[in-house]
Amino acid sequence: MMSIKNWTRVGLAGAVMAAAIIAVPALAQSDRGVEARLAALEKRVALEEDRAQIENLTRAYGYYIDKKVWSEVVPLFSKDAVVEISGRGVYKGAKGVDTLFSKVIGRQHKGLADGELSNHMVLQGVTNVAPDGKTATGRWRAFIQIGMWQKMGLWAEGTYDIRYVKEDGKWKFSLMRWYGTYFTPYDKGWAQASFGNNGPSKEFPPDAPQSVQYDAYPGHYVPPYPYPNPVTGRPWTQADTDRYSTRGMDPSNAANSSSAGSPLSLESQHPQQPPR
C-alpha cells in the first residue's frame, strides 16, 4: 500500500505537470507579444534612421549650393526628379536638374568668383517618413545672403517644399520647389524695397512653365503644408492656401514697390552677381 507521503509526491508531480501544460500556450503567446514589440521597435528605429539621412541630405544640399559645387548637387536628386526654383519654371530629370543648377542658376560657372558671397542657410525642417520607409515629405526654409564685394548685397528668404524617395537604398530628392518669400537689396532692406521672382531662362528654357503663380513680398503666399496639424490631425487644404495668400501684390507690379522687377535686374549692373 502506497504511503501518504508517496501519494503526496505523486500529487505534487501531477500538479507541476498540469501547470507546465497550461503554461506552454501562455509562454508562446508571451513570446509572440515580445516579438511583435521588437518588430515595432525595429520599425521605429528604421524610420528615425531614415529621417536622419533625409535631414543630412537636405543640409548637405545647402552647403553645396553655398559654394556652387554643382557636381555634388546633381547626384542628390533621383533620376526622375522635378525641380522648380523661384519662378524659373519646371526642370525634369537628371539633365533638367543639371541645366537648372549649373547653367541657369550657376550661369555655367563652377565655384564662387573672387569677392562673391552666396550663403543658403537651410533651416527649420519638418520631415515625415511614410510608414513603408520608401518616400517622405519635407518643408524647410532658406535664409539667403548674396553679395559681391564693394558692389552689391541682397537678402532673400523662401520655403522649400520637398518630396524624397529611397532610390537604390539611398534617400534622394524626387520633387523640390522653392517659393521665394522676399528679395531685397541689403542697403534698403525689406522695409523699403522688394523684388519679384525670377522669370524663365530664354537661353536654357524650362521643361514646363511655373506650376503656380504667387506673390512675393510685400504680398505673401502660403505653400500647402504637406503634413497635418501635429496635435489636431487636421490636413491643410488648397482652400486654406487661397485664404491665407494674397493676389496681385507681387513686386513685379510697379505700383507695389519702389524697386519693382526681378532681382535679376541687378545683373546688368553687376555682371558677376550670382543669381539665387
Positions of predicted regions on the chain:
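Short, cysteine-centered beta-strand-loop-beta hairpins and adjacent loop/turn segments enriched
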Residues: 144-154, 182-183
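C-terminal segment of classical bacterial N-terminal signal peptides
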Residues: 19-26
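A solvent-exposed, acidic/Ser-Thr-rich amphipathic alpha-helical stretch
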Residues: 70-142
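Hydrophobic/aromatic beta-strand elements that line small-molecule binding cavities or substrate pockets
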Residues: 123-127, 159-165
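Bacterial N-terminal signal peptides that target proteins for export
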Residues: 2-15
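Short, aromatic-enriched amphipathic alpha-helices that serve as compact interaction elements
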Residues: 50-66
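Terminal "cap-and-tail" regions of soluble proteins that handle hydrophobic small molecules
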Residues: 29-52, 170-276
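Beta-strand elements of well-folded, non-transmembrane domains
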Residues: 142-146, 164-166, 180
